[in-house]
C-alpha cells in the first residue's frame, strides 16, 4: 500500500511541474529560395545559382546536388572543387554558384536536397536540352522556386 501512495505522489508532482522547457521551437518561418539552373549544352556545363532571402533560422543549411544518383567529380562550388555536401550560412552567403559537367548526354536526373537539423526537402528534376521547366512548391513555411533554363 505504501508503494501506491509513493506512486500517487510522484504522478502528482509530475503533472504539476512546469513543462515550458519541453516546448518545441517553431521553425516554420517565411523563407524564399530563388534557384536558377542554367543548362549550357554546347560545352555540357550546368550552372546552378541558389539565392536565399529572408532566412531566419539559427543554423546553416546543407545543400546536396546529385546528377543521375551520384555526386559529380567535376563539381565546382564557388570556384572550388568538392565532393562533399555543401554547408553554408544563408545569413552570410546570399548565393552560391555551382558548375559541373554531366557524364551523360541528353536527359539528366538531378536530385536536389536542402536540409538542416529541423527539416529536409528532396526533389528530383529531369532536365533535357531545349526545355524550360519551373518548379514551385512550399514546404514547412519555405517557398522554393527552381527554374531550369536552356543555356545560350
Model-flagged regions — what are they?
Residues 1-4:
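Positively charged n-region of N-terminal signal peptides that target proteins for export
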Residues 13-16:
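C-terminal motif of bacterial Sec signal peptides marking the signal peptidase cleavage site
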Residues 19-76, 80-81, 130-144, 149-151:
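Acidic/polar, low-complexity intrinsically disordered N-terminal segments immediately downstream
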Residues 84-97:
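Aromatic sugar-binding surface patches on proteins
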Residues 94, 106-110:
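Exposed beta-strand face motif in extracellular beta-rich ectodomains
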Residues 100-104:
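Residue-level recognition of secondary-structure-to-loop junctions
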Residues 114-118:
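Surface-exposed loop/turn motifs at beta-strand-loop junctions within extracellular Ig-like
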Residues 121-131:
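C-terminal edge beta-strand
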Amino acid at each position: 500500500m505504501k508503494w501506491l501512495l509513493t506512486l500517487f505522489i510522484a504522478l502528482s508532482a509530475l503533472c504539476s511541474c512546469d513543462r515550458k522547457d519541453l516546448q518545441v521551437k517553431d521553425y516554420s518561418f517565411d523563407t524564399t529560395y530563388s534557384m536558377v539552373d542554367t543548362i549550357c549544352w554546347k560545352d555540357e556545363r550546368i550552372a546552378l545559382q541558389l539565392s536565399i532571402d529572408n532566412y531566419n533560422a539559427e543554423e546553416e543549411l546543407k545543400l546536396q546536388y546529385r546528377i543521375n544518383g551520384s555526386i559529380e567529380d567535376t563539381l565546382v562550388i564557388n570556384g572550388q572543387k568538392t565532393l562533399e555536401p555543401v554547408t553554408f550560412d544563408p545569413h552570410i552567403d546570399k548565393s552560391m554558384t555551382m558548375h559541373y559537367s554531366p557524364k551523360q548526354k541528353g536527359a539528366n536526373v538531378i536530385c536536389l536536397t536542402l536540409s538542416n537539423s529541423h527539416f529536409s526537402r528532396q526533389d528530383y528534376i529531369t532536365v533535357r536540352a531545349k526545355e524550360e521547366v519551373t518548379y514551385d512548391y512550399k514546404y514547412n513555411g519555405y517557398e522554393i522556386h527552381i527554374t531550369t533554363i536552356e543555356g545560350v
